[in-house]
Amino acid sequence: MSKIQILDPVTIDKIAAGEVVERPASIVKELSENAIDAGATAVTVEIEEGGISYIRIADNGCGIPKEEVPSAFLRHSTSKIRSVDDLLHIHSLGFRGEALSSIAAVSQVEMITKTQEETFGTRYRISGGKEEDLEETGAKDGTTFIIRQLFYNTPARRKFLKTPKIGRASCRERV
């Protein structure tokens, strides 16, 4: 019998990510809902290999201020609620603060975002939950997510993904 032990934070994050990100369509759903919550009037979705190797979602919403970008990828980080009382009056599609951290835990993420007030946009890269780069860049108002290599660091999860054709159909249903 194995001894009971507390899991390390990296393992916890990968397990938790599986509850939010089951397949490419989960990412399309979560990021499209974020775009709608950000006031977007246009959302573009592109996928390759059924979303397994590449998903790009671009919107013209309010964007994320540069100083808030790294925090957006932390677990339980949200702009939608502040306290338990807010749960009684939710008017957004998302509010848990789980989507971005979960997506980043199991894929390679590049986000380009710009608010209307900013002169330049921000490019942020995070892979497997580890921050890689944050830099200023030219960008339109809104946010673009590029998700690459879904479940690259959790081979058991990647093995259970459906074929690209099924993944593409599932993503199409979410849009």
List PLM regions with ranges.
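N-terminal phosphate-binding caps/lids of nucleotide- and nucleic-acid-binding domains
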Residues: M1-R174
